[in-house]
Amino acid sequence: MLSKIKDSINSLRGITEKKLEKKDGTKYIMFGGKGGVGKTTMSAATGVYLAEKGLKVVIVSTDPAHSLRDIFEQEFGHEPTKVKGYDNLYVVEIDPQKAMEEYKEKLKAQIEENPFLGEMLEDQLEMAALSPGTDESAAFDVFLKYMDSNEFDVVIFDTAPTGHTLRFLGMPEVMDKYMTKLIKLRKQMSGFMKMMKKLLPFGGKDEDIDYDKMLEELEKMKERIVRARNILSDPERTAFRLVVIPEEMSILESERAMKALQKYGIPIDAVIVNQLIPEDVQCDFCRARRELQLKRLEMIKEKFGDKVIAYVPLLRTEAKGIETLKQIAKILYGEEEKEEQKIEQKVGQ
């Protein structure tokens, strides 16, 4: 399992190992940021790193544009699939269409005993399939499944670009409010129907409807949502890591994301700066770009200075295959610190 922490807590490896040392249930690590900054690469490299440590890990992609299959060079699906070469590393690429079908079937099963509401809610579900945000709702139901499970030591979420992710992570609050209103409605309806059964001759037609059971199911759903929200806001079990590139648009979008995540109570413990041009480049264009990047690093330090900041250089090759991911993991988790130390020295000048 994991060795004792030897490095400083002010490193990505340090905060990761500290979080994993405490055996209080499954841990959750999320990677987010602007599109194209390397979220999937960091998710995959982290999965490989933790699997190499002996942990049972699943990487769950909530991004409809799945890239994990390209990085690992194998096909994945809606259910956990082992990564080739590992018995303890799995990948799930959530299929929005399948997730929506499962979501609808689950809701239909819960309302089939209530003919009064059944037709109305079924029409509502069909309309929901065409509504904006449905992907997030359906994916969130799959997300809840992994939040409820103790099958894995670590669940890594490879999230969609920032806007989608913020809507997705706002689901617990939205659904909690919705469930609270629905429970209130069911309680009112239960009392009303019981009164009607006593007053009207046709009131007995709903005698097969078990309102108490329906209410119990709603309460269970609400408890599940609240539990997920509590885990998401627990810094002992959950960490959100922003991935940025040293460009102004990426930095500003990540700053906005950080503020929104803080509003939801989701702990951000690190910022990963990706695609840094190495110091030893020879061409004038590359050196000029590196100087610009160093200025942007000052901006990153200013905006995210209270977070752990890790640095990953621009690679000479594509981020594909297990061996490349192992190399990225070594850089990311502090086993190759020379470039990071040089960057820190430059930024500090």
Curated annotation (Swiss-Prot):
Source organism, top-level taxon: Archaea
Keywords: Arsenical resistance, ATP-binding, Nucleotide-binding, Translocase
Residues reported to bind ATP: 33-40
Species of provenance: Methanocaldococcus jannaschii (strain ATCC 43067 / DSM 2661 / JAL-1 / JCM 10045 / NBRC 100440)
Pfam families, per the entry: ArsA_ATPase
Family classification: Belongs to the arsA ATPase family.
Name the UniProt record assigns to this protein: Putative arsenical pump-driving ATPase
Disulphide connectivity of cysteines: none
Keyword Calcium recorded: no
Taxonomic placement: Archaea, Methanobacteriati, Methanobacteriota, Methanomada group, Methanococci
Gene Ontology MF, one: identical protein binding
Catalytic activity: arsenite(in) + ATP + H2O = arsenite(out) + ADP + phosphate + H(+)
Gene3D superfamilies: P-loop containing nucleotide triphosphate hydrolases
Function: Anion-transporting ATPase. Catalyzes the extrusion of arsenite.
Assigned EC number: 7.3.2.7
EC category name: translocase
